[in-house]
């Protein structure tokens, strides 16, 4: 229905769609799979990236305007993972460059001396971390986010062979 087309678009879901179709294309081919991956990539690249402050937003309106400008490390991780997988699928250097932009942003904005902080406003000021759990313990740092960062960084390393990525994966 046309109502569904006008719904909000979570950037995590968009990244997962990009990862999925890129992975399927890498495994079995199929131009439709590549077309679907490219569609998800174009939306991510053209609408979800904060060109002023870095990183990807939490949620977009159907028309590509920002619905929720929160930045979450978990969200950045999925975008890095998806962009790196897309690069492996089609060798689009622009996608790899964007994955590295997000990597650099995470390493600059999300780390302290111990781990990765998770929830930020659009200007990277820390906010309450309640986006991933409606109940239970709310924490500034979780293993779930670190796990997904490692996942994204590992595929970025596979895609690029970059030593900076290798050091961060340690």
Where are these regions (language model features)?
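Glycan-recognition and catalytic cores of secretory/periplasmic carbohydrate-active enzymes
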Residues: 2-170
């Amino acid at each position: 229905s046309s109502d569904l087309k006008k719904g909000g678009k979570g950037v995590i879901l968009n990244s997962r769609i990009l990862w999925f179709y890129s992975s399927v294309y890498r495994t079995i081919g199929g131009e439709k799979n590549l077309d679907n991956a490219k569609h998800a990539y174009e939306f991510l690249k053209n609408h979800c990236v904060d060109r002023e402050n870095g990183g990807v937003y939490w949620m977009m309106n159907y028309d590509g305007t920002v619905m929720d400008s929160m930045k979450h490390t978990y969200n950045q991780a999925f975008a890095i993972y998806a962009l790196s997988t897309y690069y492996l699928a089609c060798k689009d250097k622009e996608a790899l460059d964007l994955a590295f932009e997000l990597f650099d942003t995470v390493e600059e904005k999300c780390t302290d001396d111990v781990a990765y902080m998770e929830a930020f406003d659009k200007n990277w000021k820390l906010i309450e971390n309640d986006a991933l759990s409606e109940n239970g313990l709310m924490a500034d740092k979780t293993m779930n986010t670190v796990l997904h960062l490692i996942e994204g960084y590992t595929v970025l390393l596979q895609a690029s062979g970059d030593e900076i990525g290798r050091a961060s994966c340690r």
